[in-house]
A protein has these predicted regions:
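N-terminal beta-strand motif that seeds the catalytic metal site of vicinal oxygen chelate
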Residues: 1-20, 75, 131-148
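Short glycine-enriched loop/turn motifs at secondary-structure junctions
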Residues: 3-5, 68-72, 109
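Core segments of cupin and vicinal oxygen chelate
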Residues: 10-55
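Vicinal oxygen chelate
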Residues: 13-18, 75-121
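Long, continuous compositionally biased terminal/linker segments
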Residues: 45-80, 86-90, 94-95
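A short, acidic/glycine-rich surface segment
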Residues: 58-64, 102, 134-136
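Short beta->alpha transition motifs characteristic of CBS
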Residues: 110, 116, 127-134
Length: 148
């Protein structure tokens, strides 16, 4: 058996209306289409990727997002060029998104270029460009010394 990618990811948010605004703007810019919207969720699909945004149930919440808790550390979107990363950074600035770092080159593999930012709940999101085959390139090894 061989995996064919990750079909979708579901993110739980504290304020669905605020998050819908953020994610509709971000995900449509990345080429994902809104295929479902309800009072408590929205679902975007594109490029063999699905992203579901859903309202948390307040009585089941354990607090705010921290990338160091058990669960999701961050979500990274793969882009097709360095220019796409730069275009996204310009879009994020227009959205007043919290950009944590970037765009810059990362140490993980040669040519790794990325931006790290947060959604309204502080969920860490990344967009990167990795040339060629990345870690699958001949004689390239993953450098785990970088800060995630």
């Amino acid at each position: 058996m061989k995996i064919n990618g990750i079909a979708h990811i579901a993110l739980s948010v504290s304020d669905i209306e605020n998050s819908k605004i953020f994610y509709k703007d971000l995900l449509s810019f990345l080429g994902l289409s809104l295929v479902h919207e309800s009072k408590k969720s929205c679902y975007h699909v594109g490029g063999r990727t699905g992203v579901l945004i859903q309202q948390i149930t307040k009585d089941e919440s354990c607090g705010s997002f921290s990338q160091n808790n058990v669960g999701l550390h961050h979500l990274c979107f793969r882009l097709i060029s360095k220019n796409n990363v730069d275009e996204l950074v310009a879009k994020l600035k227009k959205m007043s998104a919290n950009i944590l770092r970037g765009p810059l080159n990362g140490p993980w593999v040669p040519g790794y270029y990325y931006v790290l930012f947060e959604d309204p709940d502080g969920i860490r999101l990344e967009a990167n460009y990795v040339p060629h085959k990345g870690v699958f390139e001949k004689n390239v090894k993953f450098n785990s010394a970088g800060d995630y």
